[in-house]
Amino acid sequence: LTLFMFLSLLCHGQSYKFFTTDRELSSSLINKIYQDRNGMIWIATEDGLNRYDGAKFIIYKHDPQNEHSLCHNYVRALYEDSKGRLFVGTYNGIQLYDPATDSFSARAQWEDGKTFDSNIMSILECRNGEIWVSGNNLCTITITQGKLTAHKPDLPIPTQMTDYMIEDRQHNLWVTQGENGIYRLSADNKSKHFLKQEKGMTIVDLYEDNYGDIYLATIGKGLLKYNQPAEEFIPILYKGKQNLPIKSICQISQNELCLG
């Protein structure tokens, strides 16, 4: 079964490379693909983390006898910060990849030394350098001599499962909570709740475009755009329909968004 493909754009055509679980990939269920600043391509799956250097794959999996192995095989989030550090978010915690030893840091711990075993949904570096993670807990991560520590800030929002995050141009943090809508957290720790009574709708992605406009991809309500003067999200209809399921948003040109 072919599951993963690289596409190279050439002057007179296109070339493809196909990879399968028979020989290369650890799983057919891919959660995230990311290329780091060194050109390495990382593929997060539900059964291990894969790294491709252009010639071969290396598969990383959990080894219960090695605390510097992947802490869980279900990998959902990958994030490279401004210092080039690669964070790996799993079903059971967050780690840093160490290229010098080709291994991973010990799992993050809370300030009291207890293991931070949160199911990590997303990772974000804010403009002030803070690293935020979402999942079972919405918190910040600090790094001291390679050790990760999780900090629980006092936030004016429910502590339930949080999914995706972005920081807008005004330094507001937007946090989605699935069927519970989306929260906007301002720098002065005030919050506003949007779409809190939208039944039959789940937010699965959010995006800020080049103009600073915020969009939500949803299952049940299609694409929504934030109207800043009215402080509300409005539907973007396709052929008069609002319920077209949208799962992903990216910008492909100055004036075009790609929806999936």
Task: Kindly give the residue locations of the regions a language model identified.
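Carboxylate-rich, polar loop motifs that coordinate divalent cations or form catalytic acidic clusters
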Residues: 1-260
